[in-house]
């Protein structure tokens, strides 16, 4: 009988990526296969997120449900990973005796050894250290699961925004060597991947070592990835405005593989609140980035993150945020009511914004951005859009589903042979969460390939006297 593994994942795309690597790791080295049913599993892993409110309580509620399974099967192994594990450590075991393993985002590669320790009789195995880049050296070779793939290029964050736990739970910024990233993406391309999404808490801070001892910037990495045969689309998430430098903007001007869509968190449009958040920039500097981006890539669409009701946020501060939303014309957002994260500087600030007021502000903000997104979608009516076909439509398996450059799902009638390829469709209808298209042409009628020598990429390296992001030019 095959051994079964069940993984429950909460949180960001980095967590989704980590969970997929856990499955690959335990599948390759210990023969486990994934199951959707926790009751069937020999190992239960909970990959946690500490961003949202009451994250710890959510973990213990889930562990309470899993305890009933362990009561029936004492050999069941339960592990808790992710950011809550890093934050709470041994306190998880103290409160939930059913837990056998506690591991952080940087130690998931040690899971096989930790499982063996439990089997040998250790009552609790805890490893929430930050061994820098060792994690990636121990993971199995990448395995494609469709035409799109996520690739982690760095870990951690060194910005220490006053509201954020990431530097404390994932450590400071550590970049993977550029050669390792390029090799991983090339291997994925050989397996049919056409679009990669480069992941990190702050990808534009990427500074990866090269084989010759130099440092590869994020802008250079983007160009190297674009030159990999078979990779026709590149996305990345997430970025920080203070390191969105001109050399990155220049890539949008000359690298068509980089999509015309950017997620760039701003959190607030109020300079006073941005200062309290320790974001390191003002609203005008954010607008300067977007202005230069739109000069480099006409029609690029922008999404962002917003925190509503940060301690001390006044009606005037919120009005500044709404003004920024109108000025930029955001296409999408992840927006949340502020909740204090234990151990962060903002947790000590008096939370003097009424909850009902926070809810009203959130509803107003989300309604405005939804209206703007629908306006963009309606402008796409009658246009021809190139989409990467990801598979059957979710609601109608007789149809196909693809995604535009600006991250919209398009459903259309097409042949199964188009899955994993690019097609052009005409947009004929607009819905709240998707578009409808009519097939126009397949990939065999397109010219998608281009080549670029490494020397040409390095020739674009920014000069020492290049102006940084904090310089505003009207």
From Swiss-Prot:
Domain MTTase N-terminal residue range list: 3-120
Q: Major location, coarse class?
A: cytoplasm
SUPFAM superfamilies to which the protein is assigned, alphabetical: Radical SAM enzymes
Cellular location(s): Cytoplasm
Binding-site positions, [4Fe-4S] cluster 1 = 12, 49, 83
Q: Does the keyword Chaperone apply?
A: no
**Keyword annotations:** 4Fe-4S, Cytoplasm, Iron, Iron-sulfur, Metal-binding, S-adenosyl-L-methionine, Transferase, tRNA processing
* Top enzyme class: transferase
Write the Enzyme Commission number(s) for this entry.
Answer: 2.8.4.3
- According to the entry, every stretch annotated as the Radical SAM core domain falls at 143-375
Cofactor binding annotation:
Binds 2 [4Fe-4S] clusters. One cluster is coordinated with 3 cysteines and an exchangeable S-adenosyl-L-methionine.
Q: Name one GO molecular function term.
A: 4 iron, 4 sulfur cluster binding
Q: Cross-referenced InterPro entries, in alphabetical order?
A: Elp3/MiaA/NifB-like_rSAM, Methylthiotransferase, Methylthiotransferase_CS, Methylthiotransferase_N, Methylthiotransferase_N_sf, MiaB_methiolase, rSAM, rSAM_horseshoe
Could you say which residues bind [4Fe-4S] cluster 2 here? 157, 161, 164
Every TRAM domain range: 378-441
One cellular-component annotation, GO: cytosol
Question: Which catalysed reactions does the entry list for this protein?
Answer: N(6)-dimethylallyladenosine(37) in tRNA + (sulfur carrier)-SH + AH2 + 2 S-adenosyl-L-methionine = 2-methylsulfanyl-N(6)-dimethylallyladenosine(37) in tRNA + (sulfur carrier)-H + 5'-deoxyadenosine + L-methionine + A + S-adenosyl-L-homocysteine + 2 H(+)
Cofactors that this protein relies on: [4Fe-4S] cluster
Spell out the family assignment given in the record's similarity comment.
Answer: Belongs to the methylthiotransferase family. MiaB subfamily.
Under the subunit heading, UniProt states: Monomer.
Q: What is this protein called?
A: tRNA-2-methylthio-N(6)-dimethylallyladenosine synthase
What is the organism lineage in this UniProt record? Answer: Bacteria, Pseudomonadati, Pseudomonadota, Gammaproteobacteria, Alteromonadales
Gene encoding the protein = miaB
């Amino acid at each position: 009988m095959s051994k079964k593994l069940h993984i429950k994942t909460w949180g960001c795309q980095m967590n989704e990526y980590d969970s997929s690597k856990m499955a690959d790791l335990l599948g390759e080295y210990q023969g486990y296969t994934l199951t959707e049913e926790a009751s069937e599993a020999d190992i239960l892993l909970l990959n946690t997120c500490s961003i949202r409110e009451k994250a710890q309580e959510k973990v213990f509620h889930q562990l309470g449900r899993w305890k009933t399974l362990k009561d029936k099967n004492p050999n069941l192994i339960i592990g808790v990973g992710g950011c809550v594990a890093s934050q709470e450590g041994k306190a998880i075991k103290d409160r939930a005796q059913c837990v056998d393993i506690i591991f952080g985002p940087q130690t998931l590669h040690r899971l096989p050894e930790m499982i063996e320790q439990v089997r040998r009789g250790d009552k609790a195995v805890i490893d929430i250290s930050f061994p820098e880049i060792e994690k990636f050296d121990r993971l199995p070779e990448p395995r494609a699961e469709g035409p799109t793939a996520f690739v982690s290029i760095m870990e951690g964050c060194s910005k220490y925004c006053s509201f954020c736990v990431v530097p404390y739970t994932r450590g400071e910024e550590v970049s993977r060597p550029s050669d390792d990233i390029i090799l991983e993406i090339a291997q994925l391309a050989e397996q049919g991947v056409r679009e990669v999404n480069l992941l990190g808490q702050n990808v534009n801070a990427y500074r990866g070592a090269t084989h010759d001892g130099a440092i590869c910037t994020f802008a250079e990495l983007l160009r190297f990835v674009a030159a990999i045969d078979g990779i026709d689309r590149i996305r990345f998430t997430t970025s920080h405005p203070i390191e969105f430098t001109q050399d990155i903007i220049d890539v949008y001007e000359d690298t068509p593989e980089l999509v015309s869509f950017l997620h760039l968190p701003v959190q607030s449009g109020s300079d006073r609140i941005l200062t309290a958040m320790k974001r390191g920039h003002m609203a005008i500097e954010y607008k300067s980035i977007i202005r230069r981006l739109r000069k480099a890539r006409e029609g690029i669409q922008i999404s962002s993150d917003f925190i509503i009701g940060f301690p001390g946020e006044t009606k005037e501060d919120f009005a500044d945020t709404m003004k920024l939303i109108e000025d930029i014309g955001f296409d999408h957002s992840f927006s949340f009511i502020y909740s204090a994260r234990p151990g962060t500087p903002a947790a000590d600030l008096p939370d003097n914004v009424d909850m009902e007021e926070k809810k009203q502000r959130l509803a107003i903000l989300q309604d405005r951005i939804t209206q703007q997104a629908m306006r963009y979608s309606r402008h796409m009516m009658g246009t021809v859009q190139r989409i990467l076909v990801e598979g059957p439509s979710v609601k109608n398996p007789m149809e196909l589903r693809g995604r535009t450059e600006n991250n919209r799902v398009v459903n259309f009638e097409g042949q199964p042979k188009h899955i994993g390829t690019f097609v052009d469709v005409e947009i004929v209808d607009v819905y709240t969460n998707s578009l409808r298209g009519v097939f126009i042409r397949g990939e065999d009628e397109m010219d998608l390939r281009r080549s670029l020598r490494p020397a040409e990429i390095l020739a674009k390296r920014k000069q020492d006297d290049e102006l940084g992001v904090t310089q505003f030019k009207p």
